[in-house]
């Protein structure tokens, strides 16, 4: 049960997000203690203590980089062939896909994927995974959610990791490449994280596999593309780690959070009752440990407010979204992460004490008005 309830909102083990503390494409989540990164960034002392795992991680990262270069080069060759094969009378790409999303509704990574699918009007079925038994994903050796099963004609593909799912599907929508080919550009690799545990990471996860013309048409320039990637990674590496310490900040907030989780999740009657009270108590104490791990302030609301205002400043006053006149993948990622707090005290405080509400409501409206 403890493992199940800890999977419902993110913490250090909720997803194999990254290898070590890779810098967020130029955007660092710098703490007051001088640590960089989101999940327990590595200071000098930590580096000395964890030299073995970090060396293994560095070696795996180097291998992953070589893999990424190989797959990127292979993509360029394949893209040339695909452009020659593509028909001017190509069927609507979205209508060729049948998608099934395996999720926990209250998971911010799953919420990110839903925001993407809804904004792009991609029809999909939802399977709510029981967080205790997880029988719904027993078919998969990859045991985290979200998982998307994508049927394209006779081809059935499994997509893992929220950012890979989004990047692969967006590449598909823009380029028309077969999804079976696209997913090979995001190869998984095993690595050892700072806690000495083996994790799965994916190469190129924030990169869309587009040719120059497609990239120019979508972004208009390299700066917009880099900005989108940077803030998508920031959402995964920093923003998401502020959720649990804030929604479980006090015993009352922890109980309210688990009341919401039980109502929205796929629990049995007994499991739900146990999760509500035992889970709330467990996560209240775990949230304190997460606060220390991520070097948050005593009042974790301050970190949440700071992150929200930092995002709003990055969007700026001259455009409604980071994507300009419509949300881009960074807008959808940040929105998806924050949305899981709706209905909770932390969300109300966030809307009241930061400048994020106008942007948040614009994204909400853009998703609601997406053509069906």
Curated annotation (Swiss-Prot):
GO CC annotation terms, alphabetical: endoplasmic reticulum; membrane; mitochondrion
Pathway assigned in UniProt: Lipid metabolism; prostaglandin biosynthesis
PTM (free text): Synthesized as a Golgi membrane-associated protein, and the proteolytic removal of the N-terminal hydrophobic domain leads to the formation of a mature cytosolic enzyme.
Subunit structure: May interact with CEBPB. Interacts with EXOSC10. Homodimer.
Membrane topology: Single-pass membrane protein
Role of this protein: Isomerase that catalyzes the conversion of PGH2 into the more stable prostaglandin E2 (PGE2) (in vitro). The biological function and the GSH-dependent property of PTGES2 is still under debate. In vivo, PTGES2 could form a complex with GSH and heme and would not participate in PGE2 synthesis but would catalyze the degradation of prostaglandin E2 H2 (PGH2) to 12(S)-hydroxy-5(Z),8(E),10(E)-heptadecatrienoic acid (HHT) and malondialdehyde (MDA).
Enzyme class: isomerase
Lumenal face of the membrane: 1-54
A Pfam family matched in the record: GST_N_3
Catalytic activity annotation: prostaglandin H2 = prostaglandin E2; prostaglandin H2 = (12S)-hydroxy-(5Z,8E,10E)-heptadecatrienoate + malonaldehyde
EC number: 5.3.99.3
Biological process, per Gene Ontology: prostaglandin biosynthetic process
Cross-referenced Gene3D superfamilies: 1.20.1050.10, 6.20.200.30, Glutaredoxin
Record protein name field: Prostaglandin E synthase 2
Taxonomic placement: Eukaryota, Metazoa, Chordata, Craniata, Vertebrata
Paired cysteines (S-S): none
Membrane topology, Cytoplasmic segments: 72-372
InterPro entries per the UniProt record, alphabetical: Glutathione-S-Trfase_C-like, Glutathione-S-Trfase_C_sf, Glutathione_S-Trfase_N, PGES2, PGES2_C, Thioredoxin-like_sf
Membrane spanning residue stretches: 55-71
Provenance organism: Bos taurus
Site residues, Cleavage: 84-85
Family to which the UniProt record says this protein belongs: Belongs to the GST superfamily.
Tree of life domain: Eukaryota
Residue ranges occupied by any Glutaredoxin domain in the UniProt entry: 87-190
Residues binding glutathione, per UniProt: 145, 161-162
Localization, UniProt: Microsome membrane
């Amino acid at each position: 049960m403890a493992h199940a309830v800890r999977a419902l909102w993110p913490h250090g083990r909720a997803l194999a997000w990254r290898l070590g503390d890779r810098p967020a494409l130029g955007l660092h989540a710098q703490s007051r203690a001088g640590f960089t990164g989101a999940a327990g960034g590595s200071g000098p002392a930590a580096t000395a203590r964890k030299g073995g795992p970090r060396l293994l991680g560095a070696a795996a990262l180097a291998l992953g980089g070589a893999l990424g270069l190989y797959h990127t080069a292979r993509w360029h060759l394949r893209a040339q062939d695909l452009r020659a094969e593509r028909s001017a009378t190509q069927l609507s790409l979205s209508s060729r896909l049948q998608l099934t999303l395996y999720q926990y509704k209250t998971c911010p990574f799953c919420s990110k994927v839903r925001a993407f699918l809804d904004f792009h009007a991609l029809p999909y079925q939802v399977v709510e995974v029981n967080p205790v038994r997880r029988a719904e994903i027993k078919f998969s050796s990859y045991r985290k959610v979200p998982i998307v099963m994508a049927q394209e004609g006779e081809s059935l593909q499994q997509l893992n990791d929220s950012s890979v799912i989004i990047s692969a599907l967006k590449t598909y929508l823009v380029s028309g490449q077969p999804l079976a080919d696209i997913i090979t550009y995001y190869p998984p690799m095993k690595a050892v994280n700072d806690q000495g545990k083996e994790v799965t990471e994916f190469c190129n996860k924030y990169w869309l596999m587009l040719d120059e013309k497609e990239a120019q048409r979508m972004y208009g320039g390299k700066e917009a593309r880099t900005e989108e990637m940077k803030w998508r990674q920031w959402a995964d590496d920093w923003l998401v780690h502020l959720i649990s310490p804030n929604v479980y900040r006090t015993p009352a907030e922890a109980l309210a959070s688990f009341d919401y989780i039980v109502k929205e999740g796929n629990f049995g009657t007994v499991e739900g009752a146990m999760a509500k009270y035992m889970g709330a108590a467990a996560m209240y104490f775990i949230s304190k440990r997460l606060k220390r791990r991520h070097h948050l302030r005593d009042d974790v609301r301050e970190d949440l407010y700071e992150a929200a205002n930092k995002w709003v400043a990055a969007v700026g006053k001259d455009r409604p979204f980071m994507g300009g006149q419509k949300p881009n993948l960074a807008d959808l990622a940040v929105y998806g992460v924050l949305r899981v707090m709706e209905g909770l005290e932390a969300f109300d405080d966030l809307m009241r004490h930061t400048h994020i509400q106008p942007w948040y409501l614009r994204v909400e409206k853009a998703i609601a008005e997406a053509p069906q």
